[in-house]
Amino acid sequence: MKNNKYEIDMCNGTLMDKLISFSLPLMLSGILQLLFNAVDIIVVGRFTGSQALAAVGSTTALINIFTNLFIGISLGANVLAARFYASGKEKEMSETVHTSITLALISGLVMALAGVLLARFALNLMGTPNDVIDQSVLYMRIYFLGMPFFMLYNYGAAILRAVGDTKRPLFFLVISGMTNAVLNLVLVIVFHMGVAGGAIGTIVSQLISSILVLRCLYTSNTSYRLYFSKLGIKTQYLKQIFQVGIPAGIQSTVINLSNALLQSSVNSFGSVAMAGYTAANNIFGFLYMSVNAVTQSCMSFTSQNYGVKKLKRMDRVLLDCMILSVGVTLTLGCGAYFFGPELLKIYTSDADVIRCGVEVLAFTTVPYFCCGIMDLLPGALRGMGYSGVPMILSIIGTVGTRIVWIFGLFPAHRSLSFLFISYPVSWILTILMQAVCFCFVRKHVHQSVNRDLA
């Protein structure tokens, strides 16, 4: 089904070209979102100093913990909307849209309140050094005031992705990203507002992107048109969104808790190592966006084809996504490894900080294709409506391995290099478990659909 030039027909025609057409804007959108934070880091690091850089970086894991639960729930909205849209269920599609946008607004307000009230407590819990904690608290509190806008954009974009439209969300992020860059330069360099200026620039850019995506839904003439008078929670659709979204959100949140533990281990090396990890982690994030784009493509394509019972096409979606993910991540990972020092110099001129950043990149870039495979299998399962078991396996494989590594092995081998070997080890173990799970679920789904069609 295709209603306008922005949408992609996921259920008919060749696959690889459509996956690329869908994934590329999604990948660029993710990179632009990362650039919001990257601009903060670069401008603050260059014009305010390494302590301010460490302050901004120390909030990243915590921000991800707070946000990823609710962003994970938006995946449930994406899966449900894709299924209803492909099968032509217009009433159900409309109810899903209005429930999702209402949920986004409520989630954003809750997160804003929690972030403002709990910032200092959470940062102290992570062992943030005294020389940066005040700036970290200030940045985090201001940043979280923009959470309602952040959530509205993400849920609105999830609806557009469900119908095959990834181009307009990209356009919206180009506009808001340019605004963010200009505001950061003005507020930090001209008005000397430090970390506060970086956070304010991000809030304004998120406000703009949320207005644009809501306007897009409001002016649509399709089943996903937004009527503000219809906003509200419909329990039956909320349950279905939660069925897929909550396990995905919990998985993402718990994995980020393990990253917060890892951040605490990095903090024990001091502010120089923290700054190096901050810069390297930002580069690392660009790799993740390539993985995440292909994973979300796999989930959306699988969900639409599941809605119209095209089982063979679902299998082909996973295979083509696997080829695409491995190719992209190997290329980008090798590039990040070989050009690591040059990339880190964009963020800071401090030689010690660059050295620490290179140490982190050495064990996380080239093997990153394993992370892509690890994420694709649960993505395909969520597209079929199965989210609980992949969550449990990901937590055991990823989080369990890192906890054992940090508390069991790391104390006897204290170095950044040894700390970050835990990443590829956890990816490989999780792939093995997810592959077994996928085979069982795929067999069950095929049997169930074939019975329905008989």
Residue ranges and their predicted role:
Residues 74, 143-161, 169-180, 198-211, ...:
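Short runs within selected transmembrane alpha-helices of multi-pass transporters and secretion channels
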Residues 65-68, 180-184, 210-214, 286-289, ...:
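Hydrophobic transmembrane alpha-helices of multi-pass small-molecule transporters
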Residues 21-40, 142, 176, 205-209, ...:
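Transmembrane helical elements of multi-pass membrane transporters/channels
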Residues 12, 16-35, 39, 62-69, ...:
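Residue-level signal for short hydrophobic patches within transmembrane helices
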Residues 22, 26-34, 71, 103-112, ...:
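Hydrophobic alpha-helical transmembrane segments in multi-pass membrane proteins
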Residues 1-23, 81-146, 190-246, 302-367, ...:
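Short alpha-helical transmembrane segments in multi-pass integral membrane proteins
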Residues 35-54, 123-130, 186-193, 253-286, ...:
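Helix-terminus/linker motif at the lipid-water interface of multi-pass membrane proteins
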Residues 53-113, 150-169, 276-334, 338-340, ...:
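Small-residue-rich hydrophobic transmembrane alpha-helices
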